[in-house]
Amino acid sequence: MTQRTLGGTVRKRKRTSGFRARMRTKSGQNVIKARRRKGRARLTV
């Protein structure tokens, strides 16, 4: 019996939480700003 792994899809992930998706909305831009302020190595996925 094969196991179902919850892999996820790259395209879906990029489209919902990628950099350009974040920059599209004001609140998303705030997320990027907050992560920059905090000094995160990775801003988005």
Curated annotation (Swiss-Prot):
PROSITE patterns: RIBOSOMAL_L34. The keyword Ribosomal protein applies. One of its GO terms (molecular function) is structural constituent of ribosome. Keywords: Ribonucleoprotein, Ribosomal protein. The keyword Ribonucleoprotein applies. One of its GO terms (biological process) is translation. GO terms for cellular component: ribonucleoprotein complex; ribosome. Pfam families: Ribosomal_L34 (PF00468). Residues 22-45 are annotated as: Disordered. Residues 33-45 have a biased composition (Basic residues). It comes from the Bacteria. InterPro entries: Ribosomal_bL34, Ribosomal_bL34_CS. Belongs to the bacterial ribosomal protein bL34 family. This is Large ribosomal subunit protein bL34. It comes from Thermosynechococcus vestitus (strain NIES-2133 / IAM M-273 / BP-1).
